[in-house]
C-alpha cells in the first residue's frame, strides 16, 4: 500500500511535533510545514491531506485561513478546529476553562472521523478558545458539558475539526481518530 503524504500545518502548539510523529508512526509520509506557507507552496508538495495543529492564539495562525480552504481532506485540531470554523463563517469565543484538562465527550454523530470512538470518550483538551457557532454547511459531531461544539464536519467536503488533541496519550482512541482521517485521505486519493 502506498504511503500517503500528509502535511502538518504548524500553528506553534506545544504538541505539534506529536501530531507529526503520530502520523509517521502510522506509516505516513508526514512533514511539518509553516503556517506562513502559501497555497502554492503547499500544492507544490502534492499532499493527500492536511492536519492543522493546535497553537497559542488565532493571531499566530499565519496564512491559515487561506490554507484551510485548499481542496484536500483536512483535520483541524484545537486551534486548527477554530481556524476552520472562522474561515468558513462560524464564530469563536474565549472559553470558560483555559488550560489542558480531561474532558468527557459525547459523540453526537459517529461519522467517518469518529467511527468506532463513541458513544462516549475521554480526551485531553484546552478550551482557552472554542467554537461558539457552527459555520454554515457544517454539522455537529461531538459535545461536552464544557463546550457545545467539540467536533464538527462539513456536510459535503472532507473537512473535520476537533477541539481535543488526538495526538496525546491522555486521549482515549486518539490514534483511531487519526487512522480514520488517514482512511478518508486514502479514499479520496
Curated annotation (Swiss-Prot):
PANTHER family, alphabetized: GMP SYNTHASE [GLUTAMINE-HYDROLYZING] (PTHR11922:SF2), GMP SYNTHASE-RELATED (PTHR11922)
Record-linked CDD domains: GATase1_GMP_Synthase
The reaction(s) this protein catalyses: XMP + L-glutamine + ATP + H2O = GMP + L-glutamate + AMP + diphosphate + 2 H(+)
Gene Ontology cellular component list: cytosol
Lineage: Archaea, Methanobacteriati, Methanobacteriota, Stenosarchaea group, Methanomicrobia
Tagged with keyword Transit peptide: no
Quaternary structure and interacting proteins, as annotated: Heterodimer composed of a glutamine amidotransferase subunit (A) and a GMP-binding subunit (B).
SUPFAM superfamilies: Class I glutamine amidotransferase-like (SSF52317)
Physiological role: Catalyzes the synthesis of GMP from XMP.
Organism: Methanocella arvoryzae (strain DSM 22066 / NBRC 105507 / MRE50)
Protein name (Swiss-Prot/TrEMBL): GMP synthase [glutamine-hydrolyzing] subunit A
Enzyme Commission number, as recorded: 6.3.5.2
Catalytic residues (UniProt): 78 (nucleophile), 165, 167
Pfam families: GATase
